[in-house]
Each structure stands twice: as structure tokens, then as C-alpha cells.
Amino acid sequence: PMTSAPVDFTDPTSTEAQRFYAACEAAAVPLIKIGYWYYQEGDAYWPAIDRARKELEGFVRLSEKHGVKTLCHTHSGPVLGSNCAGLMHLLTGFDPSHVGAYIDFGHMALDGEDLAMGLAIVVEYLSAGGIKGGFHAPQPEKTPPFRPQFAALGAGSVDWHRALSLLVKMNFDGPLCVHTEYEFDETIIRQVGYADTKPPGLEEVAQKDVAFLRGILAETAA
């Protein structure tokens, strides 16, 4: 099992973080996805990385104390660690038994990072995979005329046969998390997440995604 903390969960010294990690230890939840460090336009990049790494070091200590692993998720956009290459700016030098890479194939598609290269970059830290589709949808009346958008599996730009076959070749045995983020609910996700509301038909689309994923996994393992 894995748990996902709020997007602003980046202070390891907070009471919330201390309790969160202790609760995961007590509940035998071994993987904890923390929040994101955002890049602000005009910031110097490497000092921003240094600040984020100091906070990540605190999460690594919490992981060691509670016998869990902290996960950093690749998320396209102005996020430190937005892709596999950038994520290694955060992770390099830390013990991979205490901190890991949670790669997201949908966001890799949006950022244009090659699957094989990205996985090779984070191979030492690879701990979990995020499963969602992503592509750039046309919006001809606006500038730019395309925008990032989520999609059901098989409807976006991710080559799922290649992605999953690469994981099999790497003997990856971590969790694959179906994110259930789709075109019809992107506004909801960006505003409030699913804590307070969810779009209609979510379970049905999610079930189709899981069936799609299992079908490819079966073909890949054959």
C-alpha cells in the first residue's frame, strides 16, 4: 500500500509530518508520496534545488526513523523534479532504501521525456509508477493553440505496451497506481481534487482503465 500526502506537504519538521509518518508506520503503509517544491519564475534554479534537498533530507530521516520510504513524484509544469532527469537533482546522493522515484507516465508524455531514457535515469530509485494518459489537446481560439490534458488509458500519447514492457525488463515489482484523472474532470482535480466531489461515471472509466492495464500486462508477461 501507498499513501499520498497533500501537494503542500514539504516541511518535515511540521507536527503534521511527524504524525503522518508515525501513523504510516503503525498502519504498515510503507510508501509515502510527499508534496511538491514549485519553481517560481525568476528564481535561481540551483539554490531552489538546494533548499528543496534540505527539506527532503528531513523526510529521509523520517523514513529511516519509521521504517517507510518517501516518494517524490514526477509532475509536469513548474515543479522541481518535473521529469526523471530533474527528479535526480533532488534524489542523487540519498539512500534509495529511504527515498524513491514515483514516475508518472502521463506527465512524462506531456514533458516529452523518452520512456526508456527516463526509467534508466531513475533506475536506482524507481519505487512506484503513476498510470494515467496525457496529451496536448487543441484549443484553436487560444494561445498557445494546444494545452496539456489528461485522458483515459489508450486515448493519450503514452505508449503503454512500451512503458510496461520496459518495467518488466527492469524486473520492476513496485506498485502501479491508476490515477483516475481524465479530460472530463480536469477542472475538478485542479481546483479541489476528489476530497469533496467527483465527476459522474468515474468508477466505470477507472474499471476500464484497470482492465486495459491488466490486458497489456498479461501480453507483456506472456
Q: Positions of the model-derived regions?
A:
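Active-site acidic/histidine proton-transfer and metal-coordination neighborhood
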Residues: 1-101, 196, 200-204
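Histidine-acidic metal/acid-base catalytic patches
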Residues: 28, 83-103, 109-222
